[in-house]
Structure formats: structure tokens, C-alpha cells
UniProtKB/Swiss-Prot annotation:
Homooctamer; tetramer of dimers. The keyword Transferase applies. It comes from Halobacterium salinarum (strain ATCC 700922 / JCM 11081 / NRC-1). Glycine binds at residue 267. During the catalytic reaction, a sulfide is transferred from Cys-165 to a reaction intermediate, generating a dehydroalanine residue. Pfam families: Thi4. The gene is thi4. Pathway: Cofactor biosynthesis; thiamine diphosphate biosynthesis. GO terms for molecular function: cysteine-dependent adenosine diphosphate thiazole synthase activity; iron ion binding. The lineage of its organism: Archaea, Methanobacteriati, Methanobacteriota, Stenosarchaea group, Halobacteria. This is Thiamine thiazole synthase. Its cofactor is Fe(2+). It is an enzyme of class 2 (transferase).
């Protein structure tokens, strides 16, 4: 077959096609079963598992891209690690990996391959995405039960205040998942209003530790300075993050690093098994909240405990 030409379409038709499809989907997003705030590995995994079970899921992501820190393995190196038994997730995604020559319980994979496969799996399952969309507040009901998310377009946040006043809008959901990573921004809204106590967020307030202390218009470090969670301890952190993932308030579930921040847990650094399995646990917590009559998400078999140091 030889190429002849593209189908005929003019500029106005292109614009209408984009606008029509986006509007139709966004109208569906105004009332949904679950809103997942944050499109990193834990949020994507939760979305994939829920959508696989016919739960309506919308991911809100403030960046133009999905994946969070999953695109890199740390220190600008694009190899990532997962500790056994989480390599089973890579098997499910069709991502090749090798076991480290020093530790056969540590699987190493290409980060771009793993991240793009995770994004594809969530989209293929039916999760809807609203990227360049920033979470600004929660929708609440009696006793501050969480009932949705207040959002605005991300670029609005970067405009000088004196130039713009753009009100946000609200999306309703039966459950919201905080998968926003280090900052745990959804839970923070309840904490700052005295609705719940979060050890890590309280630490931030007491010690003025934050993700980025640079001023407007300045370049700053990305803030890996233990803003709310504790310092790095891989073996301790990953198990506890998975164990403590779940419901923290009516209508609100945490997943991934937001769980570490909420509970003041240690952090795991550049290894992603806990992020992926936490997303699965979060999906189960959401289904419990929704009373979904579908099979629960299975977790891979527990790895053998590490040998004590000599």
C-alpha cells in the first residue's frame, strides 16, 4: 500500500472535534464514583484496578504529563527498582526487568518503559484523565465527609494575582483518593481545618519544612527534605506504606507517599514496589467504601524476610 493523502478536514472541524469530545467527557467527570488526585504510580495503579472493575474513575493531574517520579529511578538515572514480590506488577504490565547481580530480591527495569506501560494500562482499563488540572480544595458534606474535589486549570496558579481572578469549579465523587505524594494536599485540607490529625503534616507546621522553600520566580530544589514523612529507610518504609494505605476519613483514602506523610512514616526513596502495591490496596479500600460487588485486588505473595546482618 502506498500513501496518497490524509482525510480532508479543515481547521474549524479540528477545533470542534477536540472541543466536543473533551466537553462530553468532562461532563461525565462532574459526577463520578472516584476522583484520584495525582497521576503518579500509586494513583495510576489504583485507577487501573478500579476501572478494571467497572468503577468510574477520574484522575486529576496538575502536570501535563502523568507518572510523577516514575519516569526516573533517582539521581537522573532512568533505571528503577522494585523489591520482590512487586516485580509481579511488571510482569502484568509486560515490562522486562533483570534481578540485580548483588541482590536477587531487587528487580531493575527501564523507568520510561515501566511508567509508559502503567499509564497505558490505566487508560486501557477506562480511567479518565484530566491533566493540567490542579486540585485546590475538597467538596464536603456533613461532618466534613469528603464528596469531591475543587479544581482549576494549572496555568491559573502561575498567573500574577493582580492579573486574574478565576474561580475554580467542583467535581463530585463518592470517594476521593489522595495520591499527591510528599505533600498529601487533599488530607492537608482536612488537617488545617482541625477535622483530622496527621502526624506528618503536623510536623510540617511545627518545623516549617516544606517541599520547596524558594520564592516566586526562583529556582528551588524539588524539596526532598522530608517535608512531612520521616527520613529514608527503605526496608521499614515500604512495608508500612502498604500496611497503612487506606481510609483516613469518610470519603477519603490515601495511597503512596501521601500515606507516608499523613502517618509520619519513613520514606523509601528510589524504589517503587510500595507505590504500586499501595495503589492496589487503595483500590480495595475504595471498593469497600463503595460496597462494590467485584473481586478484590490480589497482592503478590509476600517475599521472604531479609536475612539479618552478620
Amino acid at each position: 500500500m502506498t500513501f496518497d493523502s490524509f482525510a480532508d478536514a479543515n481547521e474549524a472541524e479540528v477545533t470542534r472535534a477536540i472541543t466536543r469530545q473533551w466537553t462530553d467527557e468532562f461532563l461525565d467527570d462532574t459526577e463520578t464514583d472516584v476522583i484520584i488526585v495525582g497521576g503518579g504510580p500509586s494513583g495510576l495503579m489504583a485507577a487501573k484496578e478500579l476501572a478494571d472493575r467497572d468503577v468510574d474513575v477520574t484522575i486529576i493531574e496538575k502536570n501535563n504529563y502523568l507518572g510523577g517520579g516514575f519516569w526516573l529511578g533517582g539521581f537522573l538515572m532512568n533505571k528503577l527498582t522494585v523489591r520482590s514480590p512487586a516485580e509481579a506488577v511488571l510482569d502484568d504490565l509486560g515490562v522486562p526487568y533483570e534481578y540485580d547481580e548483588e541482590n536477587d530480591g531487587l528487580a531493575v527495569a527501564d523507568a520510561p518503559h515501566a511508567c509508559s506501560a502503567m499509564i497505558t494500562a490505566a487508560c486501557d482499563a477506562g480511567a479518565r484523565i484530566q491533566n493540567m488540572t490542579e486540585f485546590t480544595d475538597i467538596v464536603v458534606r456533613d461532618d466534613h465527609a469528603v464528596a469531591g474535589a475543587v479544581v482549576n486549570w494549572t496555568p491559573v496558579h502561575s498567573l500574577p494575582r493582580e492579573l486574574t481572578c478565576v474561580d475554580p469549579i467542583a467535581l463530585e465523587a463518592d470517594v476521593v483518593v489522595d495520591a499527591t505524594g510528599h505533600d498529601a494536599v487533599v488530607v492537608s485540607k482536612l488537617h488545617e481545618r482541625g477535622v483530622l490529625e496527621a502526624d506528618g503534616i503536623e510536623h510540617v507546621e511545627e518545623h516549617a519544612t516544606g517541599m520547596d522553600q524558594s520564592g516566586d520566580g526562583e529556582y528551588g530544589a524539588p524539596g526532598h527534605d522530608s517535608p512531612g514523612h520521616d527520613s529514608m529507610w527503605v526496608a521499614d518504609s515500604e512495608d508500612k506504606v502498604v500496611e497503612q494505605t487506606g481510609k483516613v476519613h469518610d470519603g477519603l483514602v490515601t495511597a503512596g507517599l501521601s500515606t507516608a506523610t499523613v502517618h509520619g512514616l519513613t520514606r523509601m526513596g528510589p524504589t517503587f514496589g510500595a507505590m504500586l502495591l499501595s495503589g492496589k490496596v487503595a483500590a480495595n479500600a475504595v471498593m469497600d467504601e463503595l460496597a462494590v460487588d467485584e473481586p478484590r485486588v490480589d497482592l503478590p505473595s509476600t517475599a521472604a524476610p531479609a536475612a539479618d546482618d552478620d
